[in-house]
Structure formats: C-alpha cells, structure tokens
C-alpha cells in the first residue's frame, strides 16, 4: 500500500550553520517522528496517527515524482512536541513541505523476490526506512537474480510469504496499522 508521508524542511537556522559537525538524528518513539539536520536546516518527518493510504486501485499510469498537497494539520501533535524539545525548530520558518508516497507491506518489511508467472520480473520495494536496508537488499536481490537464491535465509522479506489472505483491503489495513505504529 502507498502511504501519504509528509515531512517539512525549515528555513536555514544560523545555529546549525555555526556548527562544525552535524547534529545526530533524533527519533521520538512516543510522539512518532524523526528530526535530522539537512545542511543548515532541519527536517521533521512524523509518522502521524491519521495515516492515509493512497492509490487504492494501484499507482496511476501518469505517476512520475508526483506529490500531494501539504496537510500540516495532520502533523500538529508532532510539530508541537518537536518544537518543545528543540525550541529553535519552533522559531524557524518552513521552507518546504513534501507529501509523497512511501510504500508499505502489510508487515512493514521489504517486499522482494520473483513474480509468479512473469519471467525475469523481480520485486524489490517497500523499504520504508529509505536507504537503511539498501546494501543488504541489493546484495540479496543480485544473488537471487544471478545465482538463483540469496546467500542468507530472507523469508521475512520474500514476497511469497503472503498467501491468498493478503487481499488489497487486508494489505491497506495492515499497512495503515504499521505506519501508525512505526516507532511503537
């Protein structure tokens, strides 16, 4: 399922520009957001509890880097909490808001492997944590394609772990649940 995921980037913050080293990533599992430095700005990326699944009938044919309208009201709790924790965040203006698709499998894990009935068609998607799993996934999919199987047991990310029970509605319902509890 494709979830609507928003984050915003602040205007430049002089205190960040004055630092020699970037600040570490901050994740708040209770309020469900991440905050990280992006050059001389912050990125605040919540996993809001009012999760919204998009494209229930599949990705549109015309999709190409498409974004949706911002909906900062959905992020109000996380914005207020993060601004209290890091006061300079609340003082900074917002340079831009990004509201785009982030794919989720029903269990929150990647979805990889050969497609049944389609020769040389491979899935390698639903990496909800961005590049964090990229190296291992790249190694596994390359071994799978070139050698017939990955070096390690990767059943927990193999697309074949889902059977007939995984209908479109099931997939959407579980993806929403996983997204809402990303840091739970």
Model-derived regions: residue spans:
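C-terminal catalytic lobe of FAD-dependent flavoproteins
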Residues: 1, 30, 39, 53-54, ...
């Amino acid at each position: 399922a494709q979830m609507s995921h928003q984050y915003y980037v602040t205007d430049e913050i002089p205190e960040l520009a004055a630092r020699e080293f970037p600040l570490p990533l901050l994740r708040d599992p209770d309020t469900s957001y991440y905050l990280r430095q992006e050059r001389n700005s912050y990125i605040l990326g919540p996993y809001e509890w009012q999760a919204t699944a998009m494209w229930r009938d599949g990705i549109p044919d015309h999709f190409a880097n498409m974004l949706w309208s911002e909906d900062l009201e959905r992020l109000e709790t996380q914005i207020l909490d993060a601004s209290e924790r890091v006061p300079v965040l609340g003082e900074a203006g917002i340079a831009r808001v990004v509201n785009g698709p982030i794919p989720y499998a029903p269990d929150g894990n990647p979805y990889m492997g050969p497609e049944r009935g389609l020769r040389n068609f491979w899935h390698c998607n639903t990496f909800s944590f961005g590049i964090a799993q990229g190296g291992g996934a790249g190694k596994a999919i390359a071994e799978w394609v070139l050698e017939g199987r990955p070096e390690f047991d990767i059943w927990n990310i193999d697309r074949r772990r889902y059977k007939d029970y995984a209908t479109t509605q099931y997939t959407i319902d579980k993806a929403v649940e996983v997204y809402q509890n990303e840091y739970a």
